[in-house]
Swiss-Prot record:
Pfam families: Coiled. This is UPF0512 protein F. InterPro entries: HssA/B-related (IPR008455). It comes from Dictyostelium discoideum (Social amoeba). Belongs to the UPF0512 family.
Length: 91
């Protein structure tokens, strides 16, 4: 099995932000060479504070939970290649 990342709950509210990221089935880590997961969620007090990315997963993972820019919108950018399945961008 490949990497299975699930985002449980992301609440967009002023002051409180609770988001839990669980990664299971870590079996095909070596096959994933291009996996980028960036989580940037407005003002998160005690949510994603000290996460500095998974360096063991051969990819780039940046978790920014502090107040950056002071925006209330949650921007989630997911670009994860699972196994041999690659997303083709055309047109």
């Amino acid at each position: 099995m490949a990497i299975f990342k699930s985002i449980s709950s992301i609440s967009n509210s002023t002051g409180s932000m609770g988001s839990s990221i669980s990664a299971s089935n870590l079996d095909g880590i070596d096959s994933n060479n291009n996996s980028i997961a960036c989580f940037d969620g407005g003002c998160g007090g005690s949510g994603l504070g000290g996460w500095s990315g998974f360096n063991g997963l051969d990819g780039i993972g940046g978790f920014n939970g502090g107040c950056s820019g002071g925006s209330n919108t949650n921007i989630i950018n997911l670009d994860i290649d699972i196994g041999r399945r690659r997303h083709r961008r055309c047109c």
